[in-house]
Amino acid sequence: MKVKICGITDMETAKRACEYGADALGFVFAESKRKITPGLAKEIIQELPANVLKIGVFVNESVEVIQKITENCGLTHVQLHGDEDNHQIRRLNIPSIKALGVTSEIDMKNAQAYKTDYILFDSPKERFYGGNGKKFSWELLAHMSKKLREKTILAGGLNALNIEEAIRTVRPYMVDVSSGVETEGKKDVEKIKQFIIKAKECSK
């Protein structure tokens, strides 16, 4: 099971997450309490292992700005958390992830229309897109096609206590966590370690 730790804002957390086995790290460039500057993201990314995916999170940003930040920071993928469509995705010409809030099985069916490398299923948006710590009904994704499952990233309210049930129900390609590995709004490296251990155990 692949694991993504999202909302990275400092070097120490990034390095520790990689040491514990994270397969991907997320850097939020949209409005969020976890927002990071491109300059700091670049410093962190330069120190990370080559095999770890570096994913930039954007919300309704222009194609030009996304391309510039991707190139300058050394991102491997972009995660689109807003109202982006296939036209914008094609113009980006960057490996991409489309994030969708899930309220019914219709959302799962609509996801198949997006021409992205991965689909991230998350809780419905609130004030900020993503990272709100709330789960949705995983059963809504239990019967997706094998083709969609192989490109599915599961997010939304995940933590070390519920990750086993989430993986067993959805069987995604990757799981994504942010607030579920935080203590008082800050990344907690011990929680990151335990989350990764639990998630990896599920795929043995």
UniProtKB/Swiss-Prot annotation:
Cross-referenced CDD domains: PRAI
GO MF term set: phosphoribosylanthranilate isomerase activity
EC class (word): isomerase
Any single Pfam family the record assigns to this protein: PRAI
Pathway: Amino-acid biosynthesis; L-tryptophan biosynthesis; L-tryptophan from chorismate: step 3/5
Reactions catalysed: N-(5-phospho-beta-D-ribosyl)anthranilate = 1-(2-carboxyphenylamino)-1-deoxy-D-ribulose 5-phosphate
Keyword Amino-acid biosynthesis among record annotations: yes
Regions annotated as coiled coil: none
Biological process terms in GO annotation: L-tryptophan biosynthetic process
Keyword terms, alphabetized: Amino-acid biosynthesis, Aromatic amino acid biosynthesis, Isomerase, Tryptophan biosynthesis
Source species, domain of life: Bacteria
EC number: 5.3.1.24
Matches recorded under InterPro entries: Aldolase_TIM, PRAI_dom, RibuloseP-bd_barrel, TrpF_fam
Family affiliation: Belongs to the TrpF family.
Name of the protein in question: N-(5'-phosphoribosyl)anthranilate isomerase
Gene (UniProt): trpF
